[in-house]
Amino acid sequence: MSSTPAAGSAAEVATSSATSNAPSAPSTTASNVSNTSQPTTAGTPQARGGRGSNANGGASGSNAGGGDEPRKEAKTTPRISRALGTSAKRIQKELAEITLDPPPNCSAGPKGDNLYEWVSTILGPPGSVYEGGVFFLDIHFSPEYPFKPPKVTFRTRIYHCNINSQGVICLDILKDNWSPALTISKVLLSICSLLTDCNPADPLVGSIATQYLQNREEHDRIARLWTKRYAT
């Protein structure tokens, strides 16, 4: 006799639970049909709530709108890193070589901690009009080194038909005849050779080249004077 009310209560509880939790019971209520008829429309306010606004202006919207930019950086950064890595390794190798075995009358090394900016010292070649002088040069390596030549300029004033007042050097291996097989040591050797024997046929300062060809004595006198005045 006592089991009948228990069964009735259980039925009422089951009915109430089915009505209140209809979305969790598949294909049994109208509310569930409404939910299951749009399985892929998660963007509706009922399905997403606060996330719908985040997609437009929140973190997820920011990621969606700017996602391409980090991917582009991820693609380009390794190329730059590889280029810097190649040039840095090459420059470090040349630094070790020139430190252990510098060219005659030459020295070179980085300015402080910057591997791409060097300063060089060249002593005036013995027997030349620049003998006794100490000439300072700036050397700049680009990230494309050794596939592009270094930029080498005189900081010390010098009277030379192939070197202008800004210190720019007219030397073929620093321009069109550059090769990745060349090194900064070979460049400094070539500059020393240019101090010993200038090239008036390809001058950077035409007036000095003309004087060298037509009045060598006066040319040499002025070159020695400049060496004494600016390089000692």
Swiss-Prot record:
Pfam families noted in UniProt: UQ_con (PF00179)
Ranges of biased composition (kind: Low complexity): 1-37
Biological pathway: Protein modification; protein ubiquitination
First-tier enzyme category under EC: transferase
Stored SUPFAM superfamilies: UBC-like
Biased composition annotated in UniProt, kind: Gly residues: 58-67
Domain UBC core: 86-232
GO biological process: one example: lipid storage
Catalytic-site annotation from UniProt: 170 (glycyl thioester intermediate)
Example GO molecular function: ubiquitin conjugating enzyme activity
The enzyme's E.C. designation: 2.3.2.23
CDD domains: UBCc_UBE2E
General function of this protein: Catalyzes the covalent attachment of ubiquitin to other proteins.
Similarity comment text for this entry: Belongs to the ubiquitin-conjugating enzyme family.
Name of the protein in question: Ubiquitin-conjugating enzyme E2-24 kDa
Top-level taxonomy: Eukaryota, Metazoa, Ecdysozoa, Arthropoda, Hexapoda
